[in-house]
Amino acid sequence: TVDRGWNWATEPRQWGSATKPISDYAPALDDGTITAASAIDDYPVRDLSGYGAWPKNSHSGFYGLTTVWTALGESLNTCAVRVNESYGSAASYNYMVEKMGFTTLTQRDSQQSGNMGLGGYDVGVTTEEMAAAYAAIANDGYARGIRPVHTSADGDSIFVMASGEVEVGFDTVAALACEC
């Protein structure tokens, strides 16, 4: 819907932790860099001079060695950044753009693991892009075109159906998500 000129479906915005499964875990799981049982150190990635440990987790603590499964379930910032750095922020960027069809990411995003790891993108991503990515995970790794709903001036809903499916290679990620 459009609210005061802002289209919540098509305008890019910052999604933060909601992008971790898509920007960090999906690419690394998909190519075998990590598995659900891989151990990741839940410990600050670096000490920012004058600011302390970075990143911090929402619960303000650290678990030490933990599995990808736990890191994803607990939305651990430290682990997301570590996975993104080991996979590579440029590779994560390419995965999101080439496999998932994200169009609002910038080259600057591809150079910053903190941004890619925690969802603080240069411009942001759209609700349409996020919905399509999560739908592919839920659909065993197959992405369908977006089916927007339009409302005509007389109030009738018009569904624009997309045709065909494109495999995006999320079968491993989809299987992991089904375990939840």
Predicted regions and their residues:
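Short, glycine-/Ser/Thr-/acidic-enriched flexible segments
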Residues: 1, 29-31, 76-78, 123, ...
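Conserved catalytic neighborhood of penicillin-recognizing serine enzymes
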Residues: 34-92, 139, 143, 155-180
